């Protein structure tokens, strides 16, 4: 008979509290006095808590004997992300993530740590605590979401989207999180060990969340909820009997088929499910696939999708949506990983998710007790997470759910297979110096990085304030803030660019121009820097220099008719009519439709 493991409940409880606190903060925390009020603070919280949990994991190494496969798969993912980041052309984006995304190496390493911690520490005895947290987060989300949808938001957001952006800054992300929580709440109604009040809130909370998803206009949220809750009811049906399970599965497959057809403007569900944004995702996916095909080993670079999209997008995209509209993500997590990290990162992420599915199957085969229903609830929420990840961005406030839920599924399955049990009586402990030391060192190192990032975000926010052009003191203060932004260590390159443009605008031309050239030197694919440089040289009549940068833009963004028009005008200003006519022919070859025809008409007037 195998020895039964009895992990210390005091240690586990403390570790679980940190994991749940991470979920709470990463989902709900935002800070309005930052340039990026949502993604940056969430990434800091994620990095710091993950760093602290390292000590907890080091103290629990002896319990990983039955989890070797899990550790190897997560390590493979983290190592793949590190290799891709090291070989990426722009290290800042690779390690810290792109502007207003923050999906760099440090974020994925932190998510990997959270995954392992969830697998190691979260057990069925923690489920009441877990679902209480879900109720708390959902309650806050309901209150704030209702305020937003009624026009009572206490923050005056500069928001081009639906008002219901929640605590994640985007209605699609908010709807995704609400779908996951609605799945967890509605499925927990079937937990007989929950009180009547808890089960009542499960129903009411889930219904309100579904209403808010509908009010957000994010159809993907409804589909994610449907996928999750259907998974739960299929498992519930199979638990009753096989015939009922097969019937539920058949019905679900039929509904999924009609839903997909509806999204494609076919069938009775079209009026409910089709949105133009569904079609646009096809362009994002195709571009990502082409990036992977051209860069199969290491991809284009960690979180670098936005710097390559304009080069890989089909000509129909700008003609439909505008020449200056772009995307910084493939809107499909798997395609995103393959595009940015090549086969190395893509396969490692795919392997991780297949391992989660394997763990779930093993648990369902070997356990038919009361815990099966709880496991089914968590699995269904994980399905809901992945349903939205197939059509959306890997946002940290959403991603944290997938990694915690996935890790929990693996941990519960492995513990069930190895007969792990909790000790009957927890020991009182003094401070664990080993754990504290291994937690404090990485946390301190991450804190030093976070301090600089907070400075950069806060200064960039201040740099966006207005100034009085006629007041020399006001202009000088404005310029000083811009210089502080530019000189902040670890500052986002695009924040530096913005402040450099402000310096040029207020007369400190040489300094601002030097910064933009430095940005271009470090990242030749930064199209915004190229636009700034070409625009500046056009403004002073140096058309030869402007042409150099416009031609670089043409390589990175070949279907941008607006850039081509300006390039043609620069050639004409230098008297090179042959080149301007050549540019006119190029514009004429594709620039049609609502967005293209006006540019073509203008080009025919100015370049012929």
Model regions and ranges:
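Transmembrane signal-anchor hairpin modules in multi-pass inner-membrane enzymes, especially those
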Residues: 1-103, 111-136, 188-203, 230-253, ...
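Transmembrane alpha-helices of multi-pass inner-membrane enzymes
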Residues: 23-27, 46-54, 224, 228-232, ...
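Helix-loop-helix junctions and helix-breaking kinks within/between transmembrane helices
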Residues: 36-42, 145, 169-172, 203-235, ...
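Hydrophobic alpha-helical transmembrane segments
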Residues: 78-88, 126-157, 169, 210-216
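A membrane-periplasm/extracellular boundary helix in multi-pass inner-membrane enzymes
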Residues: 124, 148-152, 211-216, 221-225, ...
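Interfacial juxtamembrane loops and adjacent helix segments
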Residues: 148, 153-165, 275-278, 290-291, ...
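A conserved mid-to-late transmembrane alpha helix and its immediate loop/hinge
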Residues: 170, 210, 289, 319-358
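TPR alpha-solenoid repeat register
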Residues: 495, 529, 563, 596-598
